[in-house]
């Protein structure tokens, strides 16, 4: 190679290197990757690390992909847990849907049973200006306790209306000398005076309330909280209609309104539908019986005097009226009568 040719080649080589250096200098700018001659790692300017570096981008995508899997697994789990905690059921417990239990299926055997059903109203002393009706319906707490003492001493056993029905329909055995205690109208003194005495003597009564009067919180009548307390302690409740009308000769629509209104009001507060209706003032008719029977009631109570019952008369049960003038001895004589 001639000296001139060698010089020309050197010049070209130098110019080539200068061109490469210029290109690299022009392309490299802030945030672009540079190769570390010592570590061989990728370095990225903080402001552009994610956007411009390939490996971090791939790394973030992998994290996102990894995170997406737990998201699909964890989020539904967390959501279902929250729902299970905050919304356990559609209906709050313990007042679940009110139960409506069908009555016992008759076994086909005709039975006649003698079971006195005592009928009380007020358990309190009548006010000084009370009329003759109020005085007649008022049994003082002292009288009432004497009545309960007499029942115990004379060997009577307090049963429920349900017990009577099962005995008539299926022959369920009753204790000797059974008797049933009923209270009409739902007066407040039934809670303040009768209820404590019934607990003392370990007895149960049937209380027939006028549901609209309770809803309206009428003075002198039990409240729902009092009724709930008594029911929780084992006392029984039935309907005395919505507003104490004469149920005889009314249209079916009106009777349905009365039957279902009284029934649903008690079910809402006690968790079960009442089984028994006490006809207001003892006034009822054939259509009354038919409607209350179709509404799921098990039977009805009248104000007619008597102590003998059959299954055919379960919607016309007779009772023994207890008056304000009756002593324990008077009650004993009433219980012994063969009505």
Question: What are these regions, as identified by a protein language model?
Answer:
Residues 46, 51-52, 64, 87-88, ...:
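C-terminal active-site subregion of NodB/CE4 polysaccharide deacetylases
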Residues 195-202, 222-238:
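Acidic (Asp/Glu)-rich catalytic clusters
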Residues 219-225, 255-258:
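Charged helix-capping and loop-helix junction motifs
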Residues 24-26:
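C-terminal motif of bacterial Sec signal peptides marking the signal peptidase cleavage site
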Residues 2-15:
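Bacterial N-terminal signal peptides that target proteins for export
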Residues 202-222:
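A short, conserved beta-to-alpha structural element at the edge of catalytic cores
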Residues 29-112:
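Ser/Thr-rich, Proline-interspersed low-complexity disordered segments
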Residues 118, 183, 236-244:
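Histidine-centered catalytic micro-motifs
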């Amino acid at each position: 190679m001639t000296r001139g040719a060698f010089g020309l080649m050197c010049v070209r080589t130098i110019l080539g290197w200068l061109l490469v250096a210029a290109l690299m200098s022009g392309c490299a700018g802030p945030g672009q990757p540079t190769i570390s001659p010592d570590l061989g790692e990728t370095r990225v300017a903080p402001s552009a690390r994610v956007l411009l570096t390939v490996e971090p981008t791939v790394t973030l995508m992998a994290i996102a992909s990894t995170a997406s899997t737990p998201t699909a697994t964890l989020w539904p789990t967390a959501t279902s847990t929250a729902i299970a905690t905050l919304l356990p059921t559609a209906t709050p417990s313990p007042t679940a849907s009110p139960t409506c239990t069908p009555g016992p299926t008759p076994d086909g055997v005709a039975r006649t049973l003698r079971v006195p059903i005592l009928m009380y109203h007020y358990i309190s002393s009548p006010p000084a200006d009370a009329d003759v009706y109020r005085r007649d319906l008022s049994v003082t707490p002292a009288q009432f306790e004497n009545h309960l003492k007499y029942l115990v001493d004379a060997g009577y056993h307090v049963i429920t209306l349900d017990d009577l029905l099962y005995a008539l329909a299926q022959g369920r055995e009753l204790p000797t000398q059974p008797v049933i205690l009923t209270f009409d109208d739902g007066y407040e003194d039934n809670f303040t005076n009768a209820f404590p005495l019934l607990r003392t003597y370990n007895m149960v009564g049937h209380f027939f309330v006028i549901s609209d009067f309770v809803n309206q919180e009428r003075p002198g009548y039990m409240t729902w909280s009092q009724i709930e307390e008594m029911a929780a302690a084992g006392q029984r409740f039935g309907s005395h209609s919505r507003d104490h009308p004469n149920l005889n000769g009314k249209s079916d629509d009106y009777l349905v309104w009365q039957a279902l209104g009284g029934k649903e009001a008690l079910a809402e507060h006690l968790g079960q539908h009442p089984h028994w209706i006490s006809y207001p003032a003892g006034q009822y008719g054939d259509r009354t019986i038919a409607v209350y029977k179709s509404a799921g009631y098990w039977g009805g109570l009248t104000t007619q005097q008597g102590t003998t019952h059959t299954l055919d008369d379960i919607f016309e049960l007779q009772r023994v009226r207890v008056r304000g003038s009756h002593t324990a001895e008077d009650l004993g004589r009433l219980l012994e009568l063969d009505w």
